[in-house]
Amino acid sequence: GWDDDLSKLVAQYDAMINSAGCKYYIIIGDTDDPYYDAGVGETAWEATLHEAFGEHFINMRLYLIEHGLSDCGLETTFADMEGYCNGEISKQLRADWTHLNAYGYYSKGIGVYKKGVELGYWS
């Protein structure tokens, strides 16, 4: 674990990347609801990972807030909009506060694919 020490978290990611010896990687952000109202901004740990890994980081929570429903052809509800204001992913994409359902994982896959295209890993 990283014991809520963000520098330790970054060091753990760096160790895995260095151990793999691969320059082609994507750091995928968490999809948990934030403990506090994050809105559509980054949480402290998301900002830390974004700063540490730059273009290799995808903020998956924000990706799903911004694109999840449209990726799946779902309509945005009033409840979705209220949740977004608190930084929460639509319940239409979730099994619970941390796990996604089939729609959520489908959209997550699209997000990772798009990030790989952006980084030139595939076309």
Per-segment meaning from a language model:
Residues G1-S123:
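Alpha-helical cap/lid subdomain in secreted, periplasmic
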